[in-house]
Amino acid sequence: AKRIVERGENNMKTKTTAKVLGAALLTMTLARTATVYAEEEYTIGIEQFAEHGSLDNCREGFLEGLKEEGIEEGKNLSVEYKNAAADMGTCGQISDGFAADKVDLMVGIATPSAQSLYNAAMDAGIPVIYTAVTDPLAAELADDEGNPVGEITGTSDKLPVKQQLEMIRQMLPEAETIGIMYTTSEANSEAAVKEYEELAGEYDFKIETAGIATTADIPLAAQSLLEKVDCMTNLTDNTVVSSLPTILEMANEKKIPVFGSEIEQVKLGCLAAEGLDYIELGKQTGKMAAQVLKGEKKASELPFETIEEASLYVNTAAAEKLEIEIPEEMTETAAEVFEEITEA
């Protein structure tokens, strides 16, 4: 009996030792795996179509979104950032440069940049993530069901047109005609104009438009448009928004209010906007990019995403300059009220 007990004890000791060694080996393996993962480094190329607040916020939010997923500039992320200064030729040069550099991921901020990057990335086999693309279908970056047309996906900043029209009607009960300036080569802008024209009648508005090709066209187009309208509303049109101070100066001289499409435009002096938070949009995009970089998903497996909820922003300083009284209920329910105009 004594011999059996000893043998059992030895067996127990052997099993215990094996468990300890196994646990140690597993710990070492996990640690080694974690070290390898931590040492994974990425290089991305970010192309931003133009320099203005909403697109800057997208870029800021994008990097924050990556950081929240463990991918941080200066640690395991190298960023090549280029601004196209609203020039399509420059877009192509930047895109080709990223392809030649064989970056791990291309990021397009605004529609022209997204389209340009995708054209360069198709042959290079590099995935593309975009943000601030109002209509991915019109831009031919997604199919009719919202699925990617290739290794490209991202987030849309589709305008809340109904909410904007409701807000304008509430703020300007006597207004009849809304003016919209847009870039004729931007598919997103054309789609947004069409939606405004389709919905305007529901709120007893008419839409008057002015198409432009470059920023050089804006002063003359604005002058003509301001003669025909009671107010203007902006799209997320990059060429127009980059010249917003010029438009506001001309409109203010005629006491014609200009409504924005997001928070940064309201800060600059637009009367109000039903708009998106572009930092949050950027964060959402960064999290999508992290999935692609880590190999968890292919870009082609991720349908584009949107932020559904719009927020009201108003500028009381702009209202005072225009001699317009903003309804109290609007200032009370606004996500943010600005009491001064920020210099561009």
Regions found by a protein language model. Name each.
Residues 1-11:
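Short, Lys/Arg-enriched N-terminal segments with co-localized hydrophobic residues
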Residues 4-5, 18, 41:
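Compositionally biased, low-complexity repeat tracts
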Residues 15-37:
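Sec-dependent N-terminal signal peptides of Gram-positive bacterial secreted proteins and lipoproteins
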Residues 8, 38-344:
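Short hydrophobic alpha-helices and adjacent helix-cap/hinge residues
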